[in-house]
Design a protein with these regions (language model features):
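Glycine/serine-rich anion-binding loops at beta->alpha junctions
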Residues: 151-165
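C-terminal nucleotide
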Residues: 2-154
Length: 165
């Protein structure tokens, strides 16, 4: 499924995918392991899934959608008050905005706009840290320090969160 010099844009609802070329023009992708140990089974990851499901259930009372990814940022903002629990609202916001960031990231890659791609990565980390709350202090230090390095276009946590890469 993977293809050299390409990212994969995967729709997790349909499993449809498309390739987005990655043209780095001398730039490098660096993956850093924070060495923080975690277990997705026993971590708060399952709580995040449940909170996101609650956000979806609540917003479905005012929107005819199947997934949070069916909403645009603007639609979410217009209907977010239907999500009564503040934590669930943050989780829902992350899901909607992250989906929109991903769509924009694919467009940026296809247009060879690596700067925009990097900014979207940065925004993704901020959302994972502040709205989905799956980052940790060790990863935040790595990301914050990367942002200070001249030439770094983007930095974010990857994987299930709560440590790791």
């Amino acid at each position: 499924m993977g293809k050299k010099d390409n990212a994969i844009f995967l729709d997790c609802n349909t499993l449809d995918f498309e390739y987005a070329p990655i043209v780095l023009d001398g730039a490098k992708i660096v993956v850093t392991n924070s060495m923080v140990k975690h277990s997705l089974v026993t971590s708060a990851y399952n709580d995040r899934r449940n909170e996101s499901a609650q956000a979806l259930k609540d917003i479905q009372t005012v929107c005819d959608i199947k997934t949070l990814g069916d909403l645009t940022d603007e639609e979410f903002e217009a209907h977010k008050d239907a999500i009564k629990d503040e934590v669930a609202r943050k989780r829902g916001k992350h899901a909607v905005y992250e989906n929109q960031r991903t769509i924009k990231a694919v467009k940026a890659l296809k247009e060879n706009d690596i700067e925009t791609f990097g900014k979207l990565m940065n925004a993704s980390h901020v959302s994972l840290r502040d709205d989905y709350e799956t980052s940790c202090p060790e990863v935040d230090v790595l990301v914050d320090e990367a942002w200070k390095i001249p030439g770094v276009i983007g930095s974010r946590i990857t994987g299930g969160g709560f440590g790791g890469c």
